[in-house]
Swiss-Prot record:
Organism of derivation: Human cytomegalovirus (strain Merlin) (HHV-5)
Job of this protein: Plays a role in modulating the host immune response and affecting host cytokine production. Structurally and functionally homolog of host CEACAM1, induces endothelial cell angiogenesis.
SUPFAM superfamilies: Immunoglobulin
Membrane protein topology class: Single-pass membrane protein
Stated name of the protein: CEACAM1-like protein UL7
Chief place of localization: secreted
Length: 222
């Protein structure tokens, strides 16, 4: 009986120490977990390129890589003491290792929050890391459509100028018709002008002769 009574306080003491140990561990995790969770590594990569997320894990531990969508984590890679296992996540292409993963052929949908969790041999959590990945879109390339637009604009300008010239040319027959030279060549126009000049000259001669004749008649009457 005495031995039972003596062992009872020892058991209680051990239990209390265990409770205090667990309490202190939870208290430390509660105090420092927000700091750890908010320690984010910012990484960026070009669309269509590759990006590597690097951790400080050693190769002799297990590592769990996952993607965080805001509500839940999705396992994408589990590296267990030298044995890599890649779990596809929406067609995610990557290489897996304890201290890093490489994501290939990045798309805009790959942007987001990623996490890495390292485990010791005993299975306890060793460290925890957050990554914020940003995939930069490709720069817009100049398409041939812009050149086509320029050509169309230039063609339009040339067409307008050509239409003006055509309009001026179309007015020429009307002006020539008003002057009496419709559908005539330059040689015909010169001949026509010469004939008009001869007719005018003959009319002037007739007028002069008639005036001279009238003057003679008036003198004979006197």
């Amino acid at each position: 009986m005495a031995s039972d009574v003596g062992s009872h306080p020892l058991t209680v003491t051990r239990f209390r120490c265990r409770v205090h140990y667990v309490y202190n561990k939870l208290l430390i995790l509660t105090l420092f977990a927000p700091v750890i969770l908010e320690s984010v590594i910012y990484v960026s990569g070009p669309q269509g390129g590759n990006v590597t997320l690097v951790s400080n894990f050693t190769s002799n531990i297990s590592a769990r890589w996952f993607r965080w969508d805001g509500n839940d984590s999705h396992l994408i890679c589990f590296y267990k003491r030298g044995e890599g296992l890649s779990t596809p996540y929406v067609g995610l292409s990557l290489s897996c290792a304890a201290n890093q993963i490489t994501i290939f052929n990045l798309t805009l949908n790959d942007s987001g929050r990623y996490g890495a969790e390292g485990f010791t041999r005993s299975g306890e959590n060793e460290t925890f890391l957050w990554y914020n990945l940003t995939v930069k879109p490709k720069p817009l390339e100049t398409t041939p459509a812009s050149n086509v637009t320029t050509i169309v604009t230039t063609t339009s300008t040339v067409t307008d100028a050509k239409s003006n010239v055509t309009g001026n040319v179309s007015l020429a027959p009307q002006l020539r018709a008003v002057a009496g030279f419709s559908h005539q060549t330059p040689l015909e126009n010169n001949t026509h002008l010469a004939l008009v000049g001869v007719v005018v000259f003959l009319v002037l001669i007739v007028v002069c002769i008639m005036g001279w004749w009238k003057l003679l008649c008036s003198k004979s009457e006197l």
